[in-house]
C-alpha cells in the first residue's frame, strides 16, 4: 500500500507554475503564476462572475481582468494570492487531495527565512499535507543534468541566479542574484517596439509581447556584427500576426532584447551581465574547485531558451577565464523544466524518504523545523 502514494512536486516560478508527480519525467500542469481580478463588476446578474481567476483561465479572460503576479523576482510577496495558486494547483490542475500526498516545493536561492517558514505553515495548516520539503531551484536543475558539482545559471521570468554547487550543496557566499530576467526582457522589447511605432501598454498586451519574444528572439554571437547585418539587409526580419490580424515586422529587436542579459546597461541597470555574474560566482569559490565549475556551467530556466545563448556564453566566459581553462556550457534541451525534473528525481529517491518533514514533526516544532531539515 505504501508505494502507491506519489509525492507532489511543485515548482513555483515568477512566471509559470510547474506541477506534477514525483517519478514522472515532465510536469503534468504548467500554467501562468497569475491571479486576475475583474476590472469592472459584472453587469448581468446570474452570470456567475468569480471574484478571482487563476492561471490559464485568468490568461484567457485577461481582457476584462487586472493581472497580478504573486511571485516577483522569484520571491513570494502576496501570500493570499499564493494560496489561491496552490489551491488551484491541487484541486483544479492535479486534481488531488493535498492531505494525502507528501509535497516538495521549490524556492529561490537566498530566499528570506520568513518566506520559507510561511510556505511551510501554509502547506501544513491550510492544506494539511502529511509531509513537506523545500529545495533550492538551482540545485534541482543540477541534479536533473546528472551532476552534483557545477555552477547553475538559472534564469526564469523574475530573477536570474548563478549558483555554484559542490557535491550537492549550494555555496551561499558565492551565489549571485540578478534582478534581470524574462519579465524585464519583455518590458524592454515593449519599449523598443514602441520606438518602431507599435504600442503595447496594458497587462494583456504585455502577454502578446512575451509571446513575440519567445517565438522570435535570439542571442547574437557578435552583437555589433549582427547590428550591421540587420542594418544592411532584411534577412533577419520576421513578421508576427497580432490577435486582431494586424501583422508587425520585427528586425534587430529580435536580438537587441536578449542582449540585455549580457549588457544590462541597455536597461539602465548597473548589474553585471550573466557571463560576468557566472565568472564572479566562480571566483568567489575556493581555487581548488574552480576547474570543476568552469567545466560544468549548467543553464536552466525559460530565459536560457534563446537560440544562440550557449555559444555566446561559451565565448564570453572563455574570454574571462584563464586561457588554458576548459570551459563547458551545458544547455539541456529540457532546461525550461529542469528544476521540476530535478524535484521529481529527488522526491522519488529511496534515500530521500527520511528527509521529509512530517506533519507530526511540524506540530511538535512549528515552522522553524524547516531550517533544521531542509538545507
UniProtKB/Swiss-Prot annotation:
Give the EC number(s) listed in the UniProt record. 3.6.4.-
Q: Does the keyword RNA-binding apply?
A: no
> What Pfam families does the annotation carry?
Actin
Any one cellular component term from GO for this entry? mitotic actomyosin contractile ring, intermediate layer
**GO BP, sorted A to Z:** chromatin remodeling; DNA repair-dependent chromatin remodeling; endocytosis; transcription initiation-coupled chromatin remodeling
Residue positions of the PTM Phosphothreonine?
A: 202
Q: Which residues cross the membrane?
A: none
What InterPro entries does this protein's entry cite? Actin, Actin/actin-like_CS, Actin_CS, ATPase_NBD
Q: Give, from the UniProt record, the effect of changing residue 273 to D.
A: Causes a defect in the maintenance of cell polarity and septum organization
Localization: Cytoplasm, Cytoskeleton
Query: What PROSITE patterns does the entry give?
Result: ACTINS_1 (PS00406), ACTINS_2 (PS00432), ACTINS_ACT_LIKE (PS01132)
Q: Key word Hydrolase present in the record?
A: yes
Keywords, comma-separated and alphabetical? ATP-binding, Cytoplasm, Cytoskeleton, Hydrolase, Nucleotide-binding, Phosphoprotein
Matching Gene3D superfamilies: 3.30.420.40, Actin, Chain A, domain 4 (3.90.640.10)
Q: Which residues form the signal peptide?
A: none
Residues modified as Phosphoserine: 324
MF terms (GO), sorted A to Z: ATP binding; hydrolase activity; structural constituent of cytoskeleton
Q: Family, per the entry?
A: Belongs to the actin family.
> Which PANTHER family does this chain map to?
ACTIN (PTHR11937)
Q: What does this protein do?
A: Actins are highly conserved proteins that are involved in various types of cell motility and are ubiquitously expressed in all eukaryotic cells.
What is the recorded name of this protein? Actin
Provide the taxonomic classification. Answer: Eukaryota, Fungi, Dikarya, Ascomycota, Taphrinomycotina
Amino acid at each position: 500500500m505504501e508505494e502507491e502514494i506519489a509525492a507532489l512536486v511543485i515548482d513555483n516560478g515568477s512566471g509559470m507554475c510547474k506541477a506534477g508527480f514525483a517519478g514522472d519525467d515532465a510536469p503534468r500542469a504548467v500554467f501562468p503564476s497569475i491571479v486576475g481580478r475583474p476590472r469592472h463588476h459584472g453587469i448581468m446578474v446570474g452570470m456567475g462572475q468569480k471574484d478571482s481567476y487563476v492561471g490559464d483561465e485568468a490568461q484567457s479572460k485577461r481582457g476584462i481582468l487586472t493581472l497580478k503576479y504573486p511571485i516577483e523576482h522569484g520571491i513570494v510577496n502576496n501570500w493570499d494570492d499564493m494560496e489561491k495558486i496552490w489551491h488551484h494547483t491541487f484541486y483544479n490542475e492535479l486534481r488531488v487531495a493535498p492531505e494525502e500526498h507528501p509535497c516538495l516545493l521549490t524556492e529561490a536561492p537566498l530566499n528570506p527565512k520568513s518566506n520559507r517558514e510561511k510556505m511551510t505553515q501554509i502547506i501544513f495548516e491550510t492544506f494539511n499535507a502529511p509531509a513537506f520539503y523545500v529545495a533550492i531551484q538551482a540545485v534541482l536543475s543540477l541534479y536533473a543534468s546528472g551532476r552534483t558539482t557545477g555552477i547553475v545559471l538559472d534564469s526564469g521570468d523574475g530573477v536570474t541566479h548563478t549558483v555554484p554547487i559542490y557535491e550537492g550543496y549550494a555555496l551561499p557566499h558565492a551565489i549571485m542574484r540578478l534582478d534581470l530576467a524574462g519579465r524585464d526582457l519583455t518590458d524592454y522589447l515593449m519599449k523598443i517596439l514602441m520606438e518602431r511605432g507599435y504600442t503595447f501598454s496594458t497587462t494583456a498586451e504585455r502577454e502578446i509581447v512575451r509571446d513575440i519574444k519567445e517565438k522570435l528572439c535570439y542571442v547574437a554571437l557578435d552583437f555589433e556584427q549582427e547590428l550591421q547585418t540587420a542594418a544592411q539587409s532584411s534577412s533577419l526580419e520576421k513578421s508576427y500576426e497580432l490577435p486582431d490580424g494586424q501583422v508587425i515586422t520585427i528586425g534587430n529587436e529580435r536580438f537587441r532584447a536578449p542582449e540585455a542579459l549580457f549588457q544590462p546597461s541597455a536597461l539602465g541597470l548597473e548589474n553585471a551581465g550573466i557571463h560576468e555574474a557566472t565568472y564572479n560566482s566562480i571566483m568567489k569559490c575556493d581555487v581548488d574547485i574552480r576547474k570543476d565549475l568552469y567545466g560544468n556551467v549548467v543553464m536552466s530556466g525559460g530565459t536560457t531558451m534563446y537560440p544562440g545563448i550557449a555559444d555566446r556564453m561559451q565565448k564570453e566566459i572563455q574570454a574571462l577565464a584563464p586561457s588554458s581553462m576548459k570551459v563547458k556550457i551545458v544547455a539541456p534541451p529540457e532546461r525550461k523544466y529542469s528544476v521540476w525534473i530535478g524535484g521529481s528525481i529527488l522526491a522519488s529517491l529511496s534515500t530521500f524518504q527520511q528527509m521529509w518533514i512530517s506533519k507530526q514533526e511540524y506540530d511538535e516544532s512549528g515552522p522553524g523545523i524547516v531550517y533544521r531539515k531542509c538545507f
